[in-house]
Amino acid sequence: MIIDTTEIETINSFSKLESLKEVYGIIWMLVPIVTLVLGITIGVLVIVWLEREISAGIQQRIGPEYAGPLGILQALADGTKLLLKENLIPSTGDTRLFSIGPSIAVISIFLSYSVIPFGDHLVLADLSIGVFFWIAISSIAPVGLLMSGYGSNNKYSFLGGLRAAAQSISYEIPLALCVLSISLLSNSSSTVDIVEAQSKYGFWGWNLWRQPIGFIVFLISSLAECERLPFDLPEAEEELVAGYQTEYSGIKFGLFYIASYLNLLVSSLFVTVLYLGGWNLSIPYIFVPELFGINKGGKVFGTLIGIFITLAKTYLFLFIPIATRWTLPRLRMDQLLNLGWKFLLPISLGNLLLTTSSQLLSL
């Protein structure tokens, strides 16, 4: 059987087109992921700068001012310094657990960003169980901290890892119950559906007004999950040197530093999505495109406005955990566990029962 050379060339050209389509498909799949990672990195740098400026204002001192204009590049300078430092590994510790622990903590928090909607149809993965995916993924981070503490072969590190695990278990349950109440109100566990359910009723439709008790419990539980003062017992300097971070240096120590701010940012974003209306401005009589004389059909402008509103609400809310760090003293371990199990858990259960009853009566 003789095959014409033109037929062979045609077949080869089709195979090349198919391979090019596959390459373009992979590139288009990676573009939103890379964009999200870059955006998160910039967001974390902004949080570090904001925290230093706000804490300097609270303490009536001058914050960073030499690294770039207004000290905005100070976080970048600190990160570069950590990259250049020596990466020490304890000789008597478990090398694999010691090395894997920080990566697990960072990756698990990074995955949480995939279900956060930054605007209308601007979410990496609109899952039907989005909020519970976040809770499930965030519960993996303490496992990484426990591995780091155990792998360090240091009593202070191990005790810090145990505290992190105990604290996470104590406050995950009230947090999950508050999220379940929001899901019942919105008739969905998708983050996009929850935002759209709030937008139906405008500013007064925010879950902040419909779930004030749940909001307070969620706020306290998220602070505990982020290990921020007054809940920073896993790394209490006066008791545990630096907790599970004691034996770390260089880039691995930097990963823990990044993980804490990533967790703070993702918690604030979920407060915005669950309680503050997400990307919707929700102010009566004001529609942003009309305010600037732009047609409602401008999708690009609408997307940018949605991102801006989401981030504005998030960074305004961030003032609360930052100010709390420099205002309240650290709790004792027994006080922390009592607060979680004896107060927040019954309150969140009662809030869930009230929400369920109101939803049943409204049927």
From Swiss-Prot:
Query: What cystine linkages occur within this chain?
Result: none
Keywords from the named record = Chloroplast, Membrane, NAD, NADP, Plastid, Plastoquinone, Quinone, Thylakoid, Translocase, Transmembrane, Transmembrane helix
UniProt GO molecular function: NADH dehydrogenase activity; oxidoreductase activity, acting on NAD(P)H, quinone or similar compound as acceptor; quinone binding
Point out the coiled-coil segments of this chain. none
Which membrane topology describes this protein?
A: Multi-pass membrane protein
* Annotated Gene Ontology cellular component terms: chloroplast thylakoid membrane
User: Which EC number(s) does the record attach to this protein?
Assistant: 7.1.1.-
Q: Does the keyword Glycosyltransferase apply?
A: no
| GO process terms (BP) | aerobic respiration; photosynthesis, light reaction
The record's listing under InterPro entries reads:
NADH_UbQ_OxRdtase_su1/FPO, NADH_UbQ_OxRdtase_su1_CS
Q: What is its main location?
A: plastid
> Which parts of the chain span the membrane according to its record?
30-50, 98-118, 127-147, 165-185, 203-223, 248-268, 300-320, 336-356
**Keyword Lipid metabolism on entry:** no
Catalysed reaction(s) here are: a plastoquinone + NADH + (n+1) H(+)(in) = a plastoquinol + NAD(+) + n H(+)(out); a plastoquinone + NADPH + (n+1) H(+)(in) = a plastoquinol + NADP(+) + n H(+)(out)
Its name, as the record gives it, is: NAD(P)H-quinone oxidoreductase subunit 1, chloroplastic
Naturally occurring in which organism (per UniProt):
Solanum bulbocastanum (Wild potato)
